[in-house]
Amino acid sequence: MPLPLQPMPEPLIKPLADAAPGENPVHVAANLQTFLALDFGLKRTGFAVGNRLLRTAQPQGTIAAEGDARFVKIALQLKEWQPDALVVGVPFHPDGAAHENTLRARRFARQLQGRFKLPVFEVDERYTTTEALGRGARDADAMAACIILEQFLRSI
């Protein structure tokens, strides 16, 4: 059943697609140094870790779970990596329009923030899976999360 389209509250971060070229769309506090990025999918969620100082990210794997089981597995990754903040890829149509998965990813971002009490930043993830496959990724979801995090790190 399609999700009803409702006005969204102010996003946790202005998606990069809304920023002018060269514009820093958000202020990220200097104490936020390590990040865990998530490429949300209905059945699989890729994740990557990175740090601000080196502006590098590394794919780490994919969580194949839904609902509460997904959050249990994310909690394990948070315990292992201890990031200062999370970055969530939010999909849009090529023209920048939102669709059902945009709403799902934003809901996922809000759930992460509510459950784990960490800052959560949204990043436009258009074409990240295509780029991941183009890089020859064996785990396209984890590589897409890595690309999302690389984009975020370049923007701050």
Swiss-Prot record:
Subcellular location: Cytoplasm
Gene Ontology biological process: rRNA 5'-end processing
Keywords: Cytoplasm, Hydrolase, Nuclease, Ribosome biogenesis
SUPFAM superfamilies reported in the protein's UniProt record: Ribonuclease H-like
Record InterPro entries: RNaseH-like_sf (IPR012337), YqgF (IPR005227), YqgF/RNaseH-like_dom (IPR006641), YqgF/RNaseH-like_dom_sf (IPR037027)
EC primary class: hydrolase
Gene Ontology cellular component annotations, sorted alphabetically: cytosol
Molecular function via GO: nuclease activity
Primary localization: cytoplasm
EC number(s) from the headed UniProt entry: 3.1.-.-
Coiled coil region boundaries: none
Disulphides: none
Entry function: Could be a nuclease involved in processing of the 5'-end of pre-16S rRNA.
Recorded family membership: Belongs to the YqgF nuclease family.
NCBIfam families registered for this protein in UniProt: RNAse_H_YqgF
Protein's name according to its UniProt entry: Putative pre-16S rRNA nuclease
